[in-house]
Design a protein with these regions (language model features):
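Predominantly extracellular beta-rich ligand-binding scaffolds that present long acidic/polar faces
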Residues: 1-167
Length: 167
């Protein structure tokens, strides 16, 4: 899929899928800018993932408003331990508002990420959690890498890391 996606507040916004609700998604590509408002789940491919993603790719800048979960590929990955992202990549700059979780690949991970990579600059507002791969990780990461810059602001009380902002 190629094209830009613009969403409002309190949504699940993805370049290809807004909410992957139990689906098994393989060999998919999304190219284009994706943006969402406050209190949103925003991803270059999937806004909110409650399924499995493999051999998936997203390229393009991704942005979200305050109190959002923003990722180059997926905004939030799963509330259960069996939602996996495998062999996936994201390329592009990812920006979130204040108190957001922002990652080059995934904004918030609650499950598994394996064999994946992110390449792009990550930035956010005050109190944001910024990670080159994952902004807020409460799951498992294996054999994955992040390239690019994590752009923090010293007086913004942010949590940031080259791979993960908060683990």
């Amino acid at each position: 899929m190629t094209g830009d996606v613009v969403g409002g507040a309190s949504g699940n916004i993805g370049g290809l899928i807004g909410h992957n609700f139990g689906g098994n998604t393989e060999y998919v590509v999304a190219r284009g800018k994706v943006s969402g408002g406050n209190l949103s789940y925003v991803g270059g491919l999937v806004g909110y993932n409650d399924g499995d993603l493999s051999s998936a790719e997203a390229s393009g800048d991704v942005s979200g408003g305050a109190n959002s979960f923003v990722g180059g590929l997926v905004g939030t990955n799963g509330d259960f331990v069996d939602h996996r992202i495998n062999s996936a990549s994201a390329k592009g700059n990812v920006v979130g508002g204040s108190q957001s979780s922002v990652g080059g690949l995934v904004g918030q991970n609650n499950s598994f990420i394996t064999n994946s990579l992110a390449n792009g600059q990550v930035s956010g507002g005050t109190y944001a959690r910024l990670g080159g791969l994952v902004g807020l990780n409460m799951g498992d990461l294996l054999n994955s890498v992040a390239y690019g810059n994590v752009k923090f602001v010293s007086n913004y009380a942010q949590s940031y890391g080259g791979l993960v902002g908060v683990n």
